[in-house]
């Protein structure tokens, strides 16, 4: 029975059954009651290490709760310290887990092993590290616990401490010699897990103690990757500082000159070899600018990495959701195991119910025998609470093939000598990587959808299983309730038997007392033995009753537990349904997200196809900025050279002026040639410089245009990035740290924009300067050329230069306009940046809320991890059980395979059968379709044949008619004359019918007139009667009734007359219609006759006329039939009216009788008038008449009083019968008392006889005989009492019948009273004439009504009392007859005795 309940516990702990003392010890341990624990331990067979249903013992409970005194008591008593629970934890594990250092110290004093491992492979030090208890860690380390012990996942206590964010414990473990760089099974270090879970303090401790930052895990990720996943910038900065301190090679790289600087220095040397010192300064400035640009590039790289980390975070979320789905599957499996356990519990409850039933049967069969004391077993077994926990969301990185080199590695400065081919290859690789990423995302989406569908199906199946289990539990509860009802019935029966035994015991006690008085010691001893036996039996019966009650209570507790389980199942079902709905919603959300991601990926791929990669763009940007800086420096150098040349040209100008003055006087050819050669050299040099400057100017213009295009592309990309950040990449609840990073990015962009705009303005200024220098140089050249050129040419050249100057001014104005437009664009970009800042401030969450959420999530993660550990341990235990079940399943599978082989050999599979059946059905359908088509074709052909036959027949008829027409083209006159004769005969018949109908209508009209005349006569008679009645005022009520009846009859007659008139008018209209139709027919006949006389008529017209006339004849016949019906109905109505008139005549009085009555009334009126005239003279006669009337009234009062006395007599009779019944009951009670007295006397006589007799055996026999006789007498008395009860019931029924008769009499009396009232009304009318009824009469009527009401109330009260008494008698007599002597029955008997005494009194 109990072995299946302990299936979850280890096999070694199931040796002993769970006892009541174990239960008490467990409760005392949970309460912390030391005295109770020590008292229970003092008893034999108590083991504090025994496991309960949940797989824990009192020893484990005390260690987990930290009750040091209880633990000390258990250790002193003696217990196996290494005993473990279902999770494989011993007392040391539990004390370390819950942070009870004193209990841990006590256990270590008793040499508890520190290297014991639970089912997860964790030691007590692991639990202490997770519990944040440094004192327990120190104790364990002092007692030789291994600091670097690893669990099943390969995690040390240091790893768990960093994962749980416990920096003090991390430091303590490191001080105790823990390995900082120890790795788990995924090659992750403590630093990686600390970065992942965002534990800044723990990470600082690890970095200070020399944790290696550069280590990689199995997926090739370092600790900075995990810090990016955790979204903690402080940890990132710590890692950067640590990596910078470790990597000193970067400083050398910073100090060494780059290739770009060397190229720039070579360019500067080629441009100008003279200014080496200034160029060195410019080179240093350029190096500084390059370093600034590098820093900016690093920031951009960090931003790109953050974006990539976000993408990776999204992928991790997807992976976590997959893990959650797996956890849901595991939860479902656990639910299935719970359901199986509950089914086992139900089976065991059924077994217990069957055992109870067998016990009850045994008690029923042998309720007098001594009951065996059953050992109490605790049937209430606790279910193991399976904590359904979500599995730990382990962070898995992004696959390596999804990350391109541009994403993973930092950006490098592109060399100017790199070819575009390598850039295109990089772009192609990135596109391929993005495509592979898209494909993998699609595959993941399909997998997720399939998994979700599978999980939804599993959830539905689980819901169905829950419903089935619920129905089973409901049925079992109903069975338990029925069993409880049976048990209660049997309890009541056993209590009755116990009460009988009590009465028997009291009787024996009285006998013993009487024997003690006489002095028979032997009888006393024997009777004492009998008493002892009876006591034993009584105690056994009471013990059995107590056991039954305990079992009933246990069953009730089981039923309550089943109900609780049902409630839990209902809640779990609801929860599963909610989870189902949530899963469906999540599936929809994921589908939407995947569609959005696919759209984003497509857009990104399109943009990537169009746009330049970030590395190339930034390299181009850096190159342009460097070249612009170099060109600015070159322009400065050119300006300086220009100033020098101006300084050199000034003395030359002076010399030229002097030469001009001299030339005006005289010119030497040698000097002229020298000057010419000098000027030509200078002009050649200046021309070279001009060409170089123009070429440089053109290249600068091209570069400026490229820069403008690049700026436009940048603005577009910035806008696209902002829109993407708003819509896709940035969630609504991101930490303030990300906000800071975005602010930094926005500031950098603003700086870049300001730098670009500043450089753009500088370049424009440089362009203007160059143009000005060009103009000045051209002017100088022209001047130098004009020295030896005539003035006309010089003027022309000056005009050309002026025109060039105007053109250049125009160009300058256009450039200024462009600058203004560029400034407006810059302002618009600044406003967009401000808007972006505002949106960032609105849409992002503060740090506090983020940290709070983070702490809450970390705490929930810790809890879930702990619960996961417990669940894993339980799962391993369950797996051990599943191995057995699998073995059994394999045996069953073998049997199944054998049966399947037999089935395959002997039978055909269902699929083949269904396929064959489907093939046959298809063939049948095809055959049916073919047959239907053939039938349809056959029907069509038959229809066509029928139509052809009909057409042939019609053609034959037409041929016959044509032949007849050919034979007889025209009809003969003889046939027409015959037709005329027939028509005339029909017309005569119709005219005769019309004349008969008119006669009938005339007769009906005459009868109606007679009826009207008779009604008028009756009305006149009624009016005369009314006048006579008004004059004489005799029998007013009768006259009114007759008037109403006559008026009703007159109204009915009037209605009938109206109906007859309507019918008469309708008949007239019909008559007119018939006359018109006859006229039409006669006109048609005349026209036909004229036509026949004039010319021969063809046969077709004759036949059409025949048809029309036959149709008219038929219609006329139908109309005649309808009119005959109407006439018959009218005749019926007339007969009814006649009958009504006859009835009125019979009911109404004839004139002669009416006149006689009238004369009699007139005579009476004359007599009354005479008496009234003689009132004054005959007042004495009137007083005598009044006295007579008063005497009559008194007689009526006396009659009423007699009626009342009759009613009182009836009531007295009722009371007398009631008293008779009560006396009879009292007599019966007295007889019962006499019988009891006789019984006592007989008992005394028997005792005297027993005294006389010597032998004890004879006395025993006599006792048995007397007891049997007493039982027989009591049975006879019970029979007599039952007979008396039946007689009483019969009398009660008779009394009820008498009451009904009395009710009938009362109704008759009430009718008599109403008649008397009418008589009094008549008397009052006679005495006082037509006046209102007197006050006395009304008072009498009211008094009579009140008396009648009071009598009715008295009767109702008497009936109620009588019924109450009968009910009381019935209940008490039945209880007394059945032998029940409860307190209620005793109280009822006391009531009966009191009532009897009252009746006797």
From Swiss-Prot:
Highly expressed in muscle and heart, moderately in liver, kidney and pancreas, and weakly in placenta and lung. GO terms for biological process: intrinsic apoptotic signaling pathway in response to DNA damage; intrinsic apoptotic signaling pathway in response to oxidative stress; negative regulation of inflammatory response; negative regulation of non-canonical NF-kappaB signal transduction. Component of the apoptosome complex, composed of APAF1, pro-caspase-9 and UACA. In the complex, it probably interacts directly with APAF1. Interacts with LGALS3. Interacts with ARF6 and ACTB. Interacts with RAB39A. ANK repeats lie at residues 25-53, 54-83, 87-116, 120-149, 153-182, 186-215. Keywords: ANK repeat, Coiled coil, Cytoplasm, Cytoskeleton, Isopeptide bond, Nucleus, Phosphoprotein, Repeat, Ubl conjugation. InterPro entries: Ankyrin_rpt, Ankyrin_rpt-contain_sf, RAI14/UACA. The modification Phosphoserine is found at residue 265. Induction: Down-regulated in crawling cells. Up-regulated in motility-defective cells. Pfam families: Ank, Ank_2, Ank_4. It comes from the Eukaryota. GO terms for molecular function: actin binding. This is Uveal autoantigen with coiled-coil domains and ankyrin repeats protein. Residues 273-361, 423-827, 856-1368 form a coiled coil. Regulates APAF1 expression and plays an important role in the regulation of stress-induced apoptosis. Promotes apoptosis by regulating three pathways, apoptosome up-regulation, LGALS3/galectin-3 down-regulation and NF-kappa-B inactivation. Regulates the redistribution of APAF1 into the nucleus after proapoptotic stress. Down-regulates the expression of LGALS3 by inhibiting NFKB1. Modulates isoactin dynamics to regulate the morphological alterations required for cell growth and motility. Interaction with ARF6 may modulate cell shape and motility after injury. May be involved in multiple neurite formation. GO terms for cellular component: cytoskeleton; cytosol; nucleus. Its main location: nucleus. Gene3D superfamilies: Ankyrin repeat-containing domain. There is a cross-link at residue 1020 (Glycyl lysine isopeptide (Lys-Gly) (interchain with G-Cter in SUMO2)).
